[in-house]
């Protein structure tokens, strides 16, 4: 019985011994080659710049720079909302009067949900879009005051 217990303890100790792996040593007595793993980690990064204010009747540049992302991906900037009722492009004054405005990306009208800028690092690591925030028609203005509102942009990584 003692021999069985001793054998079991020796076996358990042998299984618990760890082996250290060293780099390959090549000496004059040995020949061959050795391999070494090389690792370099690049974290994803990009910068999106959206102005914090624009005056109707002027433009604003939205830009993406320093794009380093996963292969097969692209940075997408979308206009995804407004402070207007039902996401309408409207601004209000303190008394609640509303004025409608439009947004254009070049000659194209921008609607809520539209992509305004895409940067794919396969072709460029920077990009910009000039959005024109067109003032309301002068004939539609009835009340004075300072009108304000917001637009919301969403930045996504999508498959290229």
Regions found by a protein language model. Name each.
Residues 109-119:
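Short, solvent-exposed S/T- and G/P-enriched segments that are highly enriched in secreted/extracellular
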Residues 2-23:
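Sec-dependent N-terminal signal peptides of Gram-positive bacterial secreted proteins and lipoproteins
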Residues 87-111:
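A surface/secretory-pathway sequence property marking extracellular, secreted
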Residues 22-96, 117-160:
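N-terminal small/polar-rich segments of proteins
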